[in-house]
């Protein structure tokens, strides 16, 4: 199977495994359904996680289902990641779109050779793309990719009496993926929006896990590395996460859990 292509045909080949996957994730969602809207996303140190990106837009008729699915997956603790709203297909008012989201999606088209861009598109670990509103396909893709690709957890240590964090990365053997870049992603507070126009006009939608800014912290060659940085959060930010991505293959190599601002945690 070519992991650089959507898993549209793959999902039907292992129905028993898929059923078990769906039942497992259903239990995650059932447990978290009554939880607070802001979940604490954390993973034990050095345990692999799954990194999910959703390329979405308010103008897309299928996107609300994908946005909700992304929120459920992240809140369940099954994955970390964000929703990235593209600007080439968007509403005229109340837009959440960002030009860098369109660029990231175009970069994935090149990395994955996945054909024309579309929404909603979900990218798993930077390796596989799948239609973001197709729950069965998304869950099967997550299960499959988590078995073939390891995304290490980055532990961020807040420094005492400071707004800085320490990042420590162990050396890894990933020569084919180097060089890589270490990114800081700012995650917004939830957006409660009545969509003004387009396919979802008039719908009241709560958008969660929206990334509004990404910033490159520094390059990485795969060697052991420790450095500090200040996220400089604003009131509009729920929190942030740090992730490492190959500049050669687009593969996500490591990620922190969502680090929430004090206002979001209170």
Give a label for each model feature.
Residues 32-35:
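Boundary at the C-terminal end of the N-terminal hydrophobic targeting segment
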């Amino acid at each position: 199977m070519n992991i650089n292509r959507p898993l549209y045909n793959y999902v039907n080949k292992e129905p028993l495994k898929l059923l078990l996957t769906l039942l497992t994730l259903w239990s995650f969602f059932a447990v978290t359904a009554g939880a607070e809207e802001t979940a604490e996303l954390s993973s034990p140190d050095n345990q692999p996680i799954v990194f999910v990106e959703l390329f979405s837009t308010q103008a897309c008729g299928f996107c609300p289902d994908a946005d909700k699915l992304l929120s459920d997956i992240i809140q369940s603790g099954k994955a970390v990641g964000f929703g990235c709203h593209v600007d080439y297909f968007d509403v005229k008012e109340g837009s959440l779109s960002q030009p860098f989201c369109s660029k990231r999606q175009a970069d994935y088209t090149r990395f994955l050779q996945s054909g024309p861009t579309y929404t909603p598109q979900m990218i798993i670990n930077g390796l596989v793309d799948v239609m973001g509103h197709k729950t069965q396909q998304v869950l099967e893709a997550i299960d499959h990719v988590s078995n073939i690709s390891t995304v290490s957890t980055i532990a961020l240590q807040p420094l005492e009496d400071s707004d800085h964090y320490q990042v420590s990365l162990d050396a890894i053997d990933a020569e084919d993926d180097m060089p890589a870049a270490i990114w800081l992603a700012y995650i917004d507070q939830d957006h409660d929006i009545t969509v003004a126009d387009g396919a979802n006009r008039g719908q009241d939608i709560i958008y969660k896990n929206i990334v509004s800014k990404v910033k490159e912290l520094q390059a990485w060659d795969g060697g052991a590395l420790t450095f500090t940085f200040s996220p400089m959060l604003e009131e509009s930010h729920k929190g942030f996460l740090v992730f490492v991505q190959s500049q050669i293959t687009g593969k996500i190599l490591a990620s922190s859990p969502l680090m929430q601002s004090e206002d979001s945690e209170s």
